[in-house]
Swiss-Prot record:
Interacts with ADAM10; the interaction influences ADAM10 substrate specificity, endocytosis and turnover. It comes from Homo sapiens. It is a multi-pass membrane protein. This is Tetraspanin-5. The keyword Transmembrane applies. It is found in: Cell membrane. One of its GO terms (cellular component) is plasma membrane. InterPro entries: Tetraspanin/Peripherin, Tetraspanin_animals, Tetraspanin_CS, Tetraspanin_EC2_sf. One of its GO terms (biological process) is regulation of membrane protein ectodomain proteolysis. Residues 39-61, 114-232 are extracellular.
Length: 268
């Protein structure tokens, strides 16, 4: 009579190595983002003078790379090592951290819907604050130029917002050649032109409004962003729902792996 062998609880190799493989990619992406951010700061001399971090009056886009890279690095490290070494502490940390991010995203989405007007005012303030610092940082300048070109807009609510910048304002004390003008990214594009005319915005705001509409974008970036959001609401909502489902899936997998590991240890 052959004896029956009892097969105890096992750790799922599929779940273990799926979490490991996914987080290895996440980890390396985090390192890449951090590397880009630190390289950008080194190029701007920030690493040799840390106090200069607070000198910029506007938003430094490098912070996006550093914050996103830091979060991805921490998550990737915890998920990767936790799965490979079957470390329940790191796996639980991974689940909790991912859960906190999910909760913050959900809270931000609800607050953005409830306080739409307040968000709009803050966006207006944010853009105008960065308009003031347009020439202070090359990364900020490139971000503003990209935004205005992509959404075909100028300023927060119109081209006159550029009066806030010391180089573009129309005051008599402004001796800049850019006086009463706008950046080239506000200019309407001629498809036949291959070379960008960086002086196309000179004196643009001295012209009558009818003539301004021919040479520059007169709509503000806040209303243009609102329009873009309404036109692409299904896509944007789909992306956010997809990210949320991935986060929930990651939490469930990590918790499943923790349960397997604890069950195996309990059977020893």
């Amino acid at each position: 009579m052959s004896g029956k062998h009892y097969k105890g609880p096992e750790v799922s190799c599929c779940i273990k190595y799926f979490i490991f493989g996914f987080n290895v990619i996440f980890w390396f992406l985090g390192i890449t983002f951090l590397g880009i951010g630190l390289w950008a700061w080194n190029e701007k001399g920030v690493l040799s003078n840390i106090s200069s971090i607070t000198d910029l009056g506007g938003f430094d886009p490098v912070w996006l790379f550093l914050v996103v890279g830091g979060v991805m690095f921490i998550l990737g490290f915890a998920g990767c090592i936790g799965a490979l070494r079957e470390n329940t502490f790191l796996l639980k940390f991974f689940s909790v951290f991912l859960g906190i991010i999910f909760f913050l995203e959900l809270t931000a989405g609800v607050l953005a819907f409830v306080f739409k007007d307040w968000i709009k005012d803050q966006l207006y303030f944010f853009i105008n604050n960065n308009i003031r610092a347009y020439r202070d940082d090359i990364d900020l300048q490139n971000l503003i130029d990209f935004t205005q070109e992509y959404w075909q807009c100028c300023g927060a609510f119109g081209a006159d917002d550029w009066n806030l910048n010391i180089y573009f304002n129309c005051t008599d004390s402004n001796a800049s050649r850019e006086r009463c003008g706008v950046p080239f990214s506000c200019c309407t594009k001629d498809p036949a032109e291959d070379v960008i005319n960086t002086q196309c915005g000179y004196d643009a705001r001295q012209k009558p409004e009818v003539d301004q509409q021919i040479v520059i974008y007169t709509k503000g970036c806040v209303p243009q962003f609102e329009k873009w959001l309404q036109d692409n609401l299904t896509i944007v909502a789909g992306i956010f729902i997809g990210i949320a489902l991935l986060q929930i899936f990651g939490i469930c997998l990590a918790q499943n792996l923790v349960s397997d590991i604890e069950a195996v240890r309990a059977s020893w």
